[in-house]
Amino acid sequence: MSYRVGVDIGGSFTDFALFDEATQTLKTLKVFSRPDEPGAEVLEGVRLVGERYGIMPADITYFTHGTTVGINTVIQRKGLRLALFTTEHFRDVLEVARLKIPDMYNLLSKRPQPLIPRDLVFGITGRLKADGAEETALEEASVARAVEEARAAGAEGIVISLLHSYRNPAHELAAKRMVERLAPDIPVFLSSETWPIIREYERTITAVIGAYVQPRVAHYLGSLQAALKNAGVPAEPRLTKSNGGVMSAEQGKSQCVQMILSGTASGVIGAAYVAEISGIKRCISLDIGGTSADAAVIIDGQPQFGVGETIGEFQIYIPSVSVSSIGEGGGSIAWVDAQGVLKVGPESAGSRPGPACYGRGGTRATITDAFAALGLVGLSDIGYSAVTIDADKARAVVGELAGKLGRTIEETAEAIIRIAVSGMYSARSCRASASIRASSRASPSVAPAR
């Protein structure tokens, strides 16, 4: 037997799709994700497919998956301690950014703190013109001073992003050679190698994010490769890229910036394929997971692409499938604010403890609990037998909110669902729909992305 296996690792669940190349049939499996130990859910799934379907590790001849390790590293700010070398007098590139505030209607809204603090940003002497011609030679003494100060400040890696290096990387390459000679133990990352695009800030932040997540991603991929090999899986793991393509695990270790949005892209690519073979010209894919809901536009069977997708609090400027996300998924927590208004999300119960109805220690009502309290889930197999629904626990936590609101459990559960659906539609899907209507009068279809 020969199976092609696809694995989608989400914030709450990890889903397996197993395609039998001989019979052309599809099998599925769901396990809880392990954000505390990334990769453990993959090995658990490999074990369970053997128990449930009799598929042995040796039968897996193709293995690809999307991972959230990179994006979670940025969100949790657990990446490499970096220093940044910029062109002299341009130390504030990350501080100034594009001067946009997160909420344009809130004058108290604050921009996020950069991944590299200003005291770890060093200007070095040397300047290129806009056409790439050298204006001022690179000064080795200034590079040496920057290396010394970066090492003294505890830098674990150095990002070099100089003006106009997308036209001529000579100064960045020369600076890299100097750093490697002076501090061979410190890894160096170049903006011209990460993604050589015009505009200083966009190129710099993309290089910074790539360097920031690289050690954790590389460690994760190395561990996954070893674990799959030890389990007897002959296939070399592949990763989905942010643009919907695939890359090898070895490529992912050094080019992790290209797969940082791999999880969300996979669902859109799958939905686009279904739309194409179904003859649907224009549709919106909607991927509702445990933590978020992702909407994307598909036209003539093709997803739309762009740059500037959001990674945590920052934008990353690499080609990727255009996806709009809102923090409302099955595990999104319902709560009552100080004014007595019912809200849903963006905080999620995740996989641990998860919704109360999972019986894993959850004590706060979620969207899934609202469905369980109304009897809409839990009457048949849920999550391919990975989840057992306890409706009584769901009603108990929804009941706590009902008491605060002066409503019945049923009314409160229905309100939770209505708020979630309203948020998904008005905040994101409406914009996607508007994009479609701009190109055609035809109304779009909605395709589930998982």
Short names for language-model regions:
Residues 1-450:
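N-terminally biased helix-coil "hinge/interface" segments that flank
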